C-alpha cells in the first residue's frame, strides 16, 4: 500500500486530521497536486475521499448516505420489491440480523438497514473502511439515520467468521470478482475499488464458513452471467438485469 497511497488535504482546516491519519497508517503526507502515488486520500471540507491520480483518472470516491445515488435508492429504489429484499427473506423474517462480509461502500447494507434489518458490516481493506466510517459518522447528523441498526467492524472476514460465536439470521456477501474484459459499463467506483483491493479470491472459503455460521440463509451477490461459487449449488436464484442473488437455505438446528 505504501507505494500507491498517500494522504493529503484540500483545506488547512483539516491539516491536523491528515497528519494524524498519515502517522497512524505510516503513509506520506503530500501536496494536493502530487502525482507520485496511484491514490490520494484527501480530507476535503465536506468529507474524506479517495482520488486516483493521472490524466485519465476517474472522479473521487467517497461515501454519502444522505445525498446522491445512495440516498436516491433509499427513496425511490423499490423498497421491499427489490431483489435483495426477496433474497434475504424479509417476508418470512421481517427484522433479521444480517452479517455483511464484504461491506465495500455500504450501499446494500444501508438499503437493508432502512428496511428494518439489524446489519453488521465487515470490511477488511483499511482504506475502504475509512471511507465507509467517514460516511457513517457524517450521516449521524440526521435523526432518521441515528435510528438505523448499521455498524461497521474493520477486520478480515475469514478471521471474524472463524471466531464468531453469535449466529446471524443471514450472512451476505458481494465478493469482488476479476475483470473479465474492459467495458464502458464498469462504473467508476468499481474500477477504483478493483485497482485498490483486487479480487476476493477467498470467496469460496468464505462461503464454506458462512454456511456453517448462518442461522437461516447465506446470500451471495454475483454478476448475472457468472458461475456460482465453488461448493454446493444455491437453493434459490433471484436474477436481475446485471446481477443475481444466489441463496443457500439452511435447515434449522435440531
UniProtKB/Swiss-Prot annotation:
**Which PANTHER family does this chain map to?**
RIBOSOMAL RNA SMALL SUBUNIT METHYLTRANSFERASE J
Please name the GO terms that the record assigns under molecular function: 16S rRNA (guanine(1516)-N(2))-methyltransferase activity
Catalyses: guanosine(1516) in 16S rRNA + S-adenosyl-L-methionine = N(2)-methylguanosine(1516) in 16S rRNA + S-adenosyl-L-homocysteine + H(+)
Assigned GO CC terms: cytoplasm
UniProt keyword annotations, A-Z: Cytoplasm, Methyltransferase, rRNA processing, S-adenosyl-L-methionine, Transferase
Broadest EC class assigned to this enzyme: transferase
Instruction: Give me the residues that bind S-adenosyl-L-methionine, please.
Output: 107-108, 123-124, 174
- The answer to whether UniProt assigns keyword rRNA processing to this entry is yes
Return the protein name: Ribosomal RNA small subunit methyltransferase J
Cellular location(s): Cytoplasm
Protein EC = 2.1.1.242
What organism, scientifically named, is this protein from? Answer: Coxiella burnetii (strain RSA 493 / Nine Mile phase I)
Q: What does this protein do?
A: Specifically methylates the guanosine in position 1516 of 16S rRNA.
Taxonomic path: Bacteria, Pseudomonadati, Pseudomonadota, Gammaproteobacteria, Legionellales
Ranges annotated as spanning the membrane: none
Q: Which family does it belong to?
A: Belongs to the methyltransferase superfamily. RsmJ family.
Q: Does the keyword Transcription regulation apply?
A: no
Name where it mostly resides: cytoplasm
Name a biological process GO annotation: rRNA base methylation
